[in-house]
């Protein structure tokens, strides 16, 4: 579960019940994001996002595209993307798009076992994650995924059911 201490009321509340789900597994890591929301890496309930200001919560699991519901660590980069590790590698979530993307191929990660709650954001924007093979450090801004070039698409021909379709010249 998750404990919350209300300073004004001087009360401690232990929570396992969230909006639409109940935590059944321990929390491995907590991270307070720059927007004041809390990210919880659980041992089998996926990645949980809680907004303490509104008490709204959401959960990312294998049903949303995760490769595992066992999240090992979680951290945020300087662009607000949430990075987390599972038994299957390193991933990030773009909070605006709610899209989960694997960083394994981009970083050449193979067979690394990530350590619980072992993530760090360096002042220069680099992220580090502790693994069984040492420390993995990289700068998310330098990944090819984020350095997209606008490409103009030109179609010479388009076929629909083996029939060529011509575009209006304008």
Predicted regions and their residues:
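Catalytic-site microenvironment of enzymes
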Residues: 54
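Sequence-structural signature of mature extracellular/luminal beta-sheet repeat domains
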Residues: 1-8, 29, 35-38
């Amino acid at each position: 579960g998750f404990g919350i201490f209300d300073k004004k009321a001087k009360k401690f509340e232990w929570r396992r019940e969230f909006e639409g789900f109940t935590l059944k597994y321990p929390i491995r890591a907590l991270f307070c994001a720059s927007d004041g929301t809390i990210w919880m890496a659980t041992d089998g309930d996926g990645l949980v996002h809680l907004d303490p200001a509104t008490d709204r919560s959401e959960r990312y699991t294998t049903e949303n595209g995760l490769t595992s519901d066992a999240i090992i660590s979680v951290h945020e980069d300087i662009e607000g993307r949430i990075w987390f590790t599972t038994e299957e590698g390193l991933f990030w979530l773009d909070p605006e798009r709610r899209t989960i993307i694997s960083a394994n191929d981009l970083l050449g990660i193979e067979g690394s076992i990530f350590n619980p709650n072992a993530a760090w954001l360096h002042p220069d924007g680099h992220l580090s994650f502790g693994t069984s093979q040492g420390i993995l450090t990289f700068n998310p801004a330098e990944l090819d995924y984020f350095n997209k070039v606008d490409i103009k698409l030109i179609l010479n021909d388009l076929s629909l059911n083996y029939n060529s379709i011509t575009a209006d010249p304008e």
